[in-house]
Structures are given as C-alpha cells and as structure tokens.
C-alpha cells in the first residue's frame, strides 16, 4: 500500500480484493482476518479509505469489478490466494478495462499486464521447499521443522501497462523496482 501511495500521492480510495478462504483467521482481530485488519490500519494512517471486496469465485471477482465504479477507487490491491493466482489474467484484464492501477501479489500478474507486483520471489520459495523435502527424506520429522516465511521479495513494474492507462510513474518508484517490463 505504501508503494501505491508513493505512486499515487493523491489516492484516497483503495479497492481491496481478497479471498477469506486463503487467509489465516485469528480470534484476536476485529474482522477475523489479520491481513484485512493490518491493511485497514495502514490505510487509515495513510489517509486512504479501504474498500474491501470479499470474493469466493471468478463470478464474484467479476461482480466486484462491476461494482467498483460506484465507489470510485483510485487503485486496486489484490491479496494473495490460490483463487487470485488462478484468475490472475482475468483480474488484470478487468483492472485494465476500468483503467484501475493495481498492485498485485506476484510477478505473474505483472507479466500478464498488471501495473505493479510486489511479493516473494517464487523461485526462492521452491528452493526452500526442496530443502524441506530433503530434510524429510533424510528422516526429519515434519512436525519438528520450523515454519519459515519468505525472505526475498521483488518489486516488478510494467511500464507498458502504465503507458496503456496513461500513467507516469515517479522516478523514485521506478528506482526501487527489481524488474521493469518495457
């Protein structure tokens, strides 16, 4: 969200597309969704209104994009989930149809035309998974292996998309990018 705010400093409304089946729920949160609660806290600090769209299927994703113009979001944030990954191409198409700049959870979205992607380096996750498999094959008990979080993240910017929707990205945002698609 901070990248979006840096890219669009006048942004006041952010559409937030999420799938509740893919998030870990916590009894200690207001909504039961720690990711949503954190997003709400950050957007409030940034002076941005969070417009959540809870989706469980492609049909609900498409309906969310039909409904979005009613509240006029200035940007889109897509939360990582298998549903979003499976429908990444369609989500990007819908955002482009609405001229809605978005930040997406993985490089895959930027490769398909999404404006900005920020997320873990997928190849690194596979390498780390292989070390787990190796340990298990050598006799380690899976229950005794620590849970690891991603450590390598990448920022990918699609300049073709920026041009298509008529955006000029600030030089400081471009300078932070690990990869720029031209």
What do these predicted regions represent?
Residues 1-182:
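Short hydrophobic alpha-helices and adjacent helix-cap/hinge residues
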């Amino acid at each position: 969200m901070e990248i979006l705010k840096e890219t669009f400093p006048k942004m006041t409304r952010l559409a937030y597309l999420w799938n509740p089946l893919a998030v870990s729920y916590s009894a200690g949160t207001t909504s039961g969704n720690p990711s949503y609660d954190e997003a709400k806290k950050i957007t409030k600090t940034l002076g941005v209104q969070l417009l959540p769209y809870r989706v469980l299927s492609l049909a609900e994703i498409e309906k969310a994009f039909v409904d979005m113009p009613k509240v006029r979001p200035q940007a889109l944030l897509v939360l990582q989930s298998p549903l979003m990954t499976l429908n990444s191409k369609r989500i990007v198409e819908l955002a482009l149809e609405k001229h809605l700049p978005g930040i997406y959870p993985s490089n895959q979205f930027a490769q398909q035309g999404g404006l900005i992607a920020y997320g873990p380096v997928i190849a690194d996750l596979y390498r780390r998974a292989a070390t787990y498999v190796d340990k298990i094959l050598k006799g380690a008990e899976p229950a005794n292996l620590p849970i690891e979080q991603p450590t390598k993240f990448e920022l990918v910017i699609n300049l073709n998309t920026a041009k298509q929707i008529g955006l000029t990205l600030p030089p400081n945002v471009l300078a932070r990018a690990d990869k720029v698609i031209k």
